[in-house]
């Protein structure tokens, strides 16, 4: 219950810090969008890692594809391609004791942010790693990607 308020507080703090930094407006916008994407991914991961999640072991059986090397915003195309399977796994895991609030809204937010960040380029083809990832590895991988890109913008 308080987690959502804490994440909102962090998001607002990051927005204030970002807006006061002496960077170009497009860089500020990109950084802010990445920070929102990061928070959405962390919210999903926190919900999955919740100790009350009785379906975690089932969720871990589903596999996701990760890009071989994600270092640029265009690689977000790979995340976009895995959003539908991610949403389906999250919806399967819903139960009386475990419910990721607003899963559809979070996935929708992620999709909008990814589309804005990667731009309209649709010719990029993802090269996926040979090994698949669990849902936790998948989310952690994209969280690390966001943190890495944010660190290069500051």
From Swiss-Prot:
Disulphide-bridged cysteine pairs: 78-126
* Gene3D superfamilies (UniProt xref): 1.20.1250.10
Per UniProt, which keywords does this protein have?
Adaptive immunity, Cytokine, Disulfide bond, Glycoprotein, Growth factor, Immunity, Secreted, Signal
An annotated GO cellular component of this protein is:
extracellular space
Alphabetically, the GO molecular function entries are: cytokine activity; growth factor activity; interleukin-2 receptor binding
Quick check: keyword Glycoprotein in the entry? yes
Q: Where is the signal peptide?
A: 1-20
SUPFAM superfamilies with a match to the protein in the record: 4-helical cytokines
Q: Which GO terms describe its biological process?
A: activated T cell proliferation; adaptive immune response; cell surface receptor signaling pathway via STAT; extrinsic apoptotic signaling pathway in absence of ligand; interleukin-2-mediated signaling pathway; leukocyte activation involved in immune response; negative regulation of B cell apoptotic process; negative regulation of inflammatory response
Localisation: Secreted
Q: Which PANTHER family match?
A: INTERLEUKIN-2
Q: What does this protein do?
A: Cytokine produced by activated CD4-positive helper T-cells and to a lesser extend activated CD8-positive T-cells and natural killer (NK) cells that plays pivotal roles in the immune response and tolerance. Binds to a receptor complex composed of either the high-affinity trimeric IL-2R (IL2RA/CD25, IL2RB/CD122 and IL2RG/CD132) or the low-affinity dimeric IL-2R (IL2RB and IL2RG). Interaction with the receptor leads to oligomerization and conformation changes in the IL-2R subunits resulting in downstream signaling starting with phosphorylation of JAK1 and JAK3.
What protein am I looking at? Interleukin-2
Q: Which organism is it from?
A: Aotus nancymaae
């Amino acid at each position: 219950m308080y987690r959502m308020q804490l994440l909102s507080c962090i998001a607002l703090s990051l927005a204030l810090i970002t807006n006061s930094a002496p960077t170009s407006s497009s860089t500020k916008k990109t950084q802010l969008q990445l920070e929102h994407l990061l928070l959405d991914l962390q919210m999903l991961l926190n919900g999955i890692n919740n100790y009350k999640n009785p379906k975690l072991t089932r969720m871990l059986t589903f596999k996701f594809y990760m890009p071989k090397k994600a270092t640029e915003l265009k690689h977000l195309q790979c995340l976009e391609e895995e959003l539908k399977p991610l949403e389906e796994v999250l919806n399967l895991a819903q139960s009386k004791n475990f419910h990721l609030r607003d899963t559809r809204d979070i996935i929708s937010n992620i999709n909008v942010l990814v589309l804005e960040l990667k731009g309209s380029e649709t010719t990029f083809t993802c090269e996926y790693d040979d090994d698949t990832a669990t849902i936790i590895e998948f989310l952690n991988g994209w969280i690390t990607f966001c943190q890495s890109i944010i660190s290069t913008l500051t």
